[in-house]
């Protein structure tokens, strides 16, 4: 099927434009710095000593400076949530670009890893060249103390060398702990190692303070490559006759007077010895702004989250899912947002993100989250909240005398699903536990749907286990009945796809009778579904929202970009829970 350029531009255009701008900045900065150290007269003698290693080390350092500053901006999540919710970003296309913050953070991280490798390799060559090409003429320019000094001493006895080695170790730990396998199997390792970025930035500011690389300051009196008369006489070097010949005044008419340091048209004579000075550290100029912004946000988030919530109830659902309902004074959130949970009794430092499945409203202050019990943290958290005897039961009623552990929340933070209520037509597709981001949206519609732009919602939930359906079966039934009573049966189109057939009638036949006709066995036929939605919403823009496995996401993303004969445009939005 052909790609719709209209849909492609809506889904990919701004993203690729920003990627092009970012790439251009990196290429321009790399090339400009490379040329400066390769051809700049102030680095003439240093380039003679170090060669290509100097150019590559400095060019890669400039790219590292840029990306070490940019990588912090996507992590200012409170700022991004404010921009999304305020009128500062009125364009929906621009707001959707904020959803790529995590991808941009990863892209900058990968770039830092690649150019760190280039930077390290170039400086290893520089350390060798400092030793081999020790300059007897310009001793001030040397980093080595004598010719053929062991290059390893430069790596482990100088500030730039030692901090560089430490940064490589920190970066290696952060890279390996950021892989998908470790994030899923042991999130604790990812969390602890990622917080080493504070150490990384401290080392980075120290790294540039060593002053090993120097530039020439007196280019006007000592042009690079000039001949020093003092050096030639002290070394018993005689200049050729035409070198020692002086111009006589007055100069012939039509000829300009040569520069003071010029003796003839063939050679320039130095007026003084070259003077060198260490480069002014520029890294702090790059990172100070974003780092201060991030630290200010972390401080604000710490103050905002230092008061524990009040747990109202804990509900145990089938398939290892737990629901927590709580209240907190002055807490406000929008449907689709998420929060982070911090329980000191489980871990003193760990915070874990969970999508809000119930948001506070004007009439009720209760909000809640659903947790899938996967990993050490959620298992320990469940054991604290639920006694072993009640973990298999459906509901644990709230008991006033029960002592729950202290629980702190941070947020709310923005997500792509906030836009689902801003389309006239939205298609929400969930895979398994990926249904949680849509629960708050469904709860909001159940409370009051009229203030929002949304007029038709297609809700598709693909699940392997019939027990998982019970997480939100009551909510779906109430929503279905509400719109039938208000004579709006076409407002919400619910389709549930389950692969397990055993016991379906037993579980949903009586209690959830309204959903019987909404239940299908197998997987959705996505192409037919998109064609049907396009047909019934001709010429409209449909927001597509997906939270589930990557295979599901890729399928919907591809279909959203394909052309259709009804003039319908699909704008794709994705949330990942891994």
UniProtKB/Swiss-Prot annotation:
Its main location: cytoplasm. The chain crosses the membrane at residues 17-37, 63-83, 104-124, 155-175, 189-209, 425-445. PANTHER family: NADPH OXIDASE (PTHR11972), NADPH OXIDASE 4 (PTHR11972:SF206). PROSITE patterns: FAD_FR. It comes from Pongo abelii. This is NADPH oxidase 4. InterPro entries: Cyt_b245_heavy_chain, FAD-bd_8, FAD-bd_FR_type, Fe3_Rdtase_TM_dom, Fe_red_NAD-bd_6, FNR_nucleotide-bd, RBOH/FRE, Riboflavin_synthase-like_b-brl. It is a multi-pass membrane protein. Residues 304-419 form the FAD-binding FR-type domain. One of its GO terms (biological process) is cellular response to glucose stimulus. N-glycosylation is required for the function.
């Amino acid at each position: 099927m052909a790609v719709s350029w209209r849909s492609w531009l809506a889904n990919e255009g701004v993203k690729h434009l920003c990627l092009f701008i970012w790439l251009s900045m990196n290429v321009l900065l790399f090339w400009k710095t490379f040329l400066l150290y390769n051809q700049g007269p102030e680095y003439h003698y240093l380039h003679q000593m170090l060669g290509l290693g100097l150019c590559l080390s400095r060019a890669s350092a400039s790219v590292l400076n840029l990306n070490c500053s940019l990588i912090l901006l996507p992590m200012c999540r409170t700022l991004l949530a404010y921009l999304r919710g305020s009128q500062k970003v009125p364009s929906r296309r621009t707001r959707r670009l904020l959803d790529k913050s995590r991808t941009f953070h990863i892209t900058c991280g990968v770039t830092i890893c690649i150019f760190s490798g280039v930077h390290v390799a170039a400086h290893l060559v520089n350390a060798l060249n400092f030793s081999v090409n020790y300059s007897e003429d310009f001793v001030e320019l040397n980093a080595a103390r004598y010719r053929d000094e062991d290059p390893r001493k430069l790596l482990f006895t100088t500030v730039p060398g030692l901090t560089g080695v430490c940064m490589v170790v920190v970066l290696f730990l952060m890279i390996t702990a950021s892989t998908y396998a470790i994030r899923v199997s042991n999130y604790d390792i990812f969390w602890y190692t990622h917080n080493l970025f504070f150490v990384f930035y401290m080392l980075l500011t120290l790294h540039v303070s060593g002053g090993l690389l120097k530039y020439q300051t007196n280019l006007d009196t000592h042009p690079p490559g000039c001949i020093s008369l003092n050096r030639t006489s002290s070394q018993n070097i005689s200049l050729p006759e035409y070198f020692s010949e002086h111009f006589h005044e007055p100069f012939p008419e039509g000829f300009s007077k040569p520069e003071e340091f010029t003796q003839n048209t063939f050679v320039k004579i130095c007026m003084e010895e070259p003077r060198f000075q260490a480069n002014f550290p520029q890294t702090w100029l790059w990172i100070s702004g974003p780092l201060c912004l991030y630290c200010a946000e972390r401080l604000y988030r710490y103050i905002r989250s230092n008061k524990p919530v009040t747990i109202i109830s804990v509900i145990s659902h089938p398939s290892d899912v737990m629901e927590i309902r709580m209240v907190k004074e002055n807490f406000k959130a929008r449907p689709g947002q998420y929060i982070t949970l911090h329980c000191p009794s489980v871990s003193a430092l760990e915070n874990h993100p969970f999508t809000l499945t119930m948001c506070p409203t004007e009439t009720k202050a209760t909000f809640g989250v659903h947790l899938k019990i996967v990993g050490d943290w959620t298992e320990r958290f469940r054991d604290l909240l639920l006694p072993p005897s009640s973990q298999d039961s459906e509901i644990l009623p709230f008991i006033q005398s029960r002592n729950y552990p202290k629980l702190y929340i941070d947020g709310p933070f923005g997500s792509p699903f906030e836009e689902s209520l801003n389309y006239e037509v939205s298609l929400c597709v969930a895979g398994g536990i990926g249904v949680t981001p849509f629960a708050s949206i469904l709860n909001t519609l159940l409370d009051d749907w009229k203030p929002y732009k949304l007029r038709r919602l297609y809700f598709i939930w693909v699940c392997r286990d019939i027990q998982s359906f019970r997480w939100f079966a009551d909510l779906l039934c109430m929503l279905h009945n509400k719109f039938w009573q208000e004579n709006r049966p076409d407002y919400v189109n619910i389709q549930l796809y389950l692969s397990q057939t055993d016991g379906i009638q037993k579980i949903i036949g009586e209690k959830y009778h309204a959903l019987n006709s909404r239940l299908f066995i197998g997987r959705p036929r996505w192409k037919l579904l998109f064609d049907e939605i396009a047909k019934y919403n001709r010429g409209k823009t449909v927001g597509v929202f997906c939270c589930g496995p990557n295979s599901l996401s890729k399928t919907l993303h591809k279909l959203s970009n394909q052309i259709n004969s009804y003039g319908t445009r699909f704008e794709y939005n994705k949330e990942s829970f891994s």
